[in-house]
Amino acid sequence: MSEVLRSFGLAVRIFRERQGWSQAQLAQNSGIDRAYISRIESGGVDPGLEMQRRLANALGISHTELIAQAEEEEQRRRRRPDRSGDQPA
């Protein structure tokens, strides 16, 4: 699983939880299947641009805000030491 996809999924979850929504509520508001949202949030699927825009629109944010949050999460992941305690290269 790609770290970028995991970071994007985490960004979706962060914004969803800020709304106080369950995955089912996001699914209803976006028209995207709940199981697919679960896969997005876990980093198990690469949502295309249209899907990203639908998620952002449902969450009441811009696509740019969603991507910026994903990039921030990716930077946090890179700064964290790995399990052995070494800093990432």
Residue ranges and their predicted role:
Residues 12, 26-27, 37-40, 66:
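Conserved hydrophobic/aromatic packing and binding residues within compact polymer-binding modules
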Residues 6, 17-18, 46:
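Short amphipathic helical patch at the helix-1/turn junction of helix-turn-helix
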Residues 41, 51, 70:
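DNA major-groove recognition helix of helix-turn-helix
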Residues 2, 65-89:
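Short, charged recognition helix plus adjacent turn
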Residues 10-29, 54, 80-88:
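Short basic helix-loop element that most often maps to the first helix and adjoining turn
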Residues 50-65:
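DNA major-groove recognition helix of helix-turn-helix/homeodomain DNA-binding modules
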Residues 31-45:
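Recognition helix of helix-turn-helix/homeodomain-like DNA-binding domains
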